[in-house]
Amino acid sequence: LPDKAEARLALGLVPDKPTVFIFGGSLGARSINLAMEASVEKFRQAGIQVLWQTGKNYTPNSALNAENIKIMQFVDDMRTNYAAADVVVCRAGATTIAELAIIRKPAILVPFPQAANDHQ
């Protein structure tokens, strides 16, 4: 992975600020997006910057645009986003869990309630 500070600079973030990367996959995750909407102000007050990948089916309220929040519909470069993050909040998909394990990144995993045979 790239260096954390370099990754943050490349993403237009402050290099020495705590950073959370939040995503729900290419389509996004409604529950994650709604939780993020409700948390924007708390992140700002805590001095935490957020990389928020919403998915292509979600458009956040323009009032959620804050200097500490970078909103993206889709992420092409997961490596840089992973590198920039201190912690990741995401769906508990098998590929994502494998990626997080390989890079040893702390994560909060959100189960997908409609997963076939409860495979989460």
Language-model region placement:
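Donor-nucleotide binding loops and adjacent catalytic segments primarily
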Residues: 6, 11-90, 97
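A general structural motif
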Residues: 88-94, 115-119
